[in-house]
């Protein structure tokens, strides 16, 4: 019986050949180098950043945001775009629904002059444009609004009433197979906004499902279920919505966490309101009756006054946000050696 080959030597030879053929680092041991912290794009709501477990939406990954109509899906995506741009990133918006409101986007903090926008005619065109932008390596965040509006060319060119079973699902499956690797290499975060449909004849469990087949469910690293739970009123006038987001899938941290925050009409996610809610929960802010206090200083009587105080004093708002993140350990925690080895920032 021949002698068994030296496994270590055989492995080193194989690794050397792989490095030569496919480039250095094609295969590596997981513990061999300090792992870079997960770069993230903040969502604009600290409660949602906390629920995600890493401080925001992960870079280089597929994100699905779905929910009923007018629940705040596009608002959440546009806040992520604004935060990416604020940190010097390039953003693109594939407006398949042809419903993007530039004025509203500007109010949320989006630099509409720099935002790349496409209003494609077909689903194939939309996903081809998205793929080319991702492969350029220049893009930081891409939003596709929405999956339901990615209509296959055959359906557009066909007659009303023609059956096109599975066309959109096949289109999404092929596109995600092509794009996922390129996203990871380029660090582009892709947010797919999706709509809800109801399955017919479901007796048990939820009849709700999302459009575009099952591929997006598998490829998404994070899936967010956005729901409007309450209408906010000032006097008798509706001024916004209380929104609940459930993290139904999360490959980066434990899933099934929930976040609640306010979306104000014309202003988007209330960052200050989210800071007040989280600050009280974490005992960083004190609520006594209707008064909110921070470090002995009164912020205001009632949430609206406290919100206005923080809006007028951004330094205090930033300090509260920093303390909340430190207390909850949001983002990657690095030791001294890792900091030297990996200079990449935690927040995008």
From Swiss-Prot:
An annotated Gene Ontology molecular function: single-stranded DNA binding
Gene Ontology, cellular component aspect: cytosol
Similarity comment: Belongs to the RecA family.
CDD domains registered for this protein in UniProt: RecA (cd00983)
Annotated binding of ATP, by residue: 67-74
Keywords: ATP-binding, Cytoplasm, DNA damage, DNA recombination, DNA repair, DNA-binding, Nucleotide-binding, SOS response
Any Pfam family the entry gives: RecA
Xref: SMART domains: AAA
Record has Chloroplast as a keyword: no
Compartments, record wording: Cytoplasm
GO aspect biological process, one term: DNA repair
Chief subcellular location: cytoplasm
Primary role: Can catalyze the hydrolysis of ATP in the presence of single-stranded DNA, the ATP-dependent uptake of single-stranded DNA by duplex DNA, and the ATP-dependent hybridization of homologous single-stranded DNAs. It interacts with LexA causing its activation and leading to its autocatalytic cleavage.
Gene3D superfamilies, alphabetized: P-loop containing nucleotide triphosphate hydrolases
Protein name listed in UniProt: Protein RecA
Superkingdom field: Bacteria
Keyword Transmembrane in record: no
């Amino acid at each position: 019986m021949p002698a068994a080959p030296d496994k270590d030597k055989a492995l080193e030879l194989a690794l050397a050949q792989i490095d030569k053929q496919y480039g250095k680092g094609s295969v590596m041991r997981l513990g061999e180098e300090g792992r870079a912290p997960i770069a993230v794009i903040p969502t604009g709501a600290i409660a949602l950043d906390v629920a995600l477990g890493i401080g925001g939406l992960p870079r280089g990954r597929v994100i699905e945001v779905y929910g009923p109509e007018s629940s705040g899906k596009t608002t959440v995506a546009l806040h992520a775009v604004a935060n990416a741009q604020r940190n010097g990133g390039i953003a693109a918006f594939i407006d398949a629904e042809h419903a993007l409101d530039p004025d509203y986007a500007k109010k949320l903090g989006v630099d509409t002059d720099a935002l790349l926008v496409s209003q494609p005619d077909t689903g194939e065109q939309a996903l081809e444009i998205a793929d080319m932008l991702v492969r350029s390596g220049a893009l930081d965040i891409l939003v596709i609004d929405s999956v339901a509006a990615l209509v296959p060319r055959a359906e557009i060119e066909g007659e009303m009433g023609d059956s096109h079973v599975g066309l959109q699902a096949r289109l999404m499956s092929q596109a995600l197979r092509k794009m996922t690797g390129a996203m990871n290499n380029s660090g582009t975060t892709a947010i797919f906004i999706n709509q809800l449909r109801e399955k017919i004849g479901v007796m048990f469990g939820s009849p709700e499902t999302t459009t575009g087949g099952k591929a997006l469910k598998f490829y998404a690293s994070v899936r967010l279920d956005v729901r409007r739970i309450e209408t906010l009123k000032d006097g008798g006038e509706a001024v916004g919505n209380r929104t609940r987001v459930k993290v139904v899938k999360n490959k980066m941290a434990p899933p099934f966490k929930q976040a609640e925050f306010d979306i104000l009409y014309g202003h988007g996610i209330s960052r200050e309101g989210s800071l007040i809610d989280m600050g009280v929960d974490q005992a960083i802010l004190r609520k006594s009756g209707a008064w909110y206090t921070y470090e002995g200083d009164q912020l205001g009587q009632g949430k609206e006054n406290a919100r206005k105080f923080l809006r007028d004093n951004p330094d205090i708002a930033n300090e509260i946000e920093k303390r909340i993140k430190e207390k909850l350990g949001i983002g990657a925690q690095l030791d001294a050696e890792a900091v030297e080895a990996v200079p990449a920032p935690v927040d995008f």
